[in-house]
Each structure stands twice: as C-alpha cells, then as structure tokens.
Amino acid sequence: MEKICVIIPTYNNATTIRRVIEDVEKYCSSIIVVNDGSTDDTAAILQSIPSPIEVVSYPDNRGKGYALVTGFKKAKALGYTHAITIDADGQHFADDIPCFIEGLKHNPEGFIVGCRNLTEENMPRQNTFANRFSNFWFRLQTGINLPDTQSGYRLYTLSSLKGLNLITSRY
C-alpha cells in the first residue's frame, strides 16, 4: 500500500509558504516542510501554523538539492513510500496533487514530473530560454519529450532513490 507525503523545500518564502501549505492540506495531510536556512520570517510562520506538519530546519542555506534529500530522508524515516515535491513560491497548483496520485496508480514505481505554464507572460525571459534549452537537451539525450524538465513539482518513489549518487546539493 502506498503511503504518500508532500515535501515542500523552502528558502525565504515568507510571503507564500502559509498559502502553499493551506492549499496542499486540501489534498494531503502528510506534509514535510524543509526550511533551508531561511533568513526572513519563514521559520516563524511555520511555527505558527497549527496543523500537524513536520518541519525540518537548519540554520544555513545548503541549497534546494540538500533540502530535497533531507525531506526524502525524513519521509523514509516516517514510513512513506512516495513523496510529491512542490515549490514553496506558489508557482505550482496543489489541486494537481490528485493527478499525481492517479498517475501513481498506473505506474507504482514511476517518477512523475508536473508541468508549469511556461508562457513568457508567466516567467522571466531568461528563465523561459533556460527551460526551453533544458527541455531540448533532455529530448536530444533521451528521445523523451518533456515540456518542463526543470519543474519542482514531482512524484518520487522513495525506494528508487536508494544509492543515488548526487554530485551537488545546490541547484
């Protein structure tokens, strides 16, 4: 039986973190927030949220990769089999969480990548170019066409991460 949580890595997202958590709670009550050394009011906001969220904090910013690995380790320690990651800046819609869960039913060992609206009016020009180039390069190397390879909105099968040799924690 799948046991699913949502991991929210955050760094200085005081203006959006509460809303993101409230939106996620509508679809999943198992939430792990990793506070990656925020220097704004993020930590205080997380402490003020009455819901039973798991919060992992550390004092220095280590990078999103480190925050994700920390969240995955916490999720595994709590007995979760799968984790959905969602960015804390509000660019992903929590109401897509059921789509990830439905996709998991069809591919229980899978890896699912969500897709943002990458139109130029929704994203700075340099980000649009970088994402298009990344998508092109991914397609060239794998033959697989993914519209948003850089999306932080993903579902991971936690057992598949065992032994993964990550070469950097900052991205």
Report each predicted region and the residues it spans.
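Short, well-formed alpha-helical segments that are part of the catalytic scaffolds
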Residues: Y11-Y27
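Acidic helix N-cap motif at the loop->helix transition within catalytic regions
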Residues: T15-R19, D40-S48, D95
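Cell-envelope/extracellular polymer assembly enzymes that use nucleotide-activated donors
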Residues: K3-C5, S30
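Acceptor/aglycone-binding surface of glycosyltransferases and processive sugar-polymer synthases
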Residues: D60-K74, H82, A94-Y171
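Conserved sequence signature across two-component system core domains
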Residues: T10-Y11, V34-D36, Y58
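Conserved donor nucleotide-binding strand/loop of the catalytic core
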Residues: I32, A43-L78
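A conserved acidic beta->alpha catalytic loop
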Residues: N35-A44, G90
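Short beta-strand-to-loop acidic/aromatic patch adjacent to the donor-nucleotide binding site
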Residues: Y80-Q91
